């Protein structure tokens, strides 16, 4: 169940990525990297290295997006909560 929630949140994040202005290349790059890390988690659920890297990056990037992109920040917080429920 939580893995489906994670997939849904990832889909939402991909849609939100398209709302970031093209001139904000830094934010777009950060978000693309987060999406890739989440996809790695979904594809390799047993890989602890990906899990640790993902959580650290998510927590840090949530703050970055909080002011300019609050919807993205909330989605990232949702993903962190899902990962915690998954025991990651």
Which residues does each predicted region cover?
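Charged low-complexity stretches with an acidic bias
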Residues: 55-88
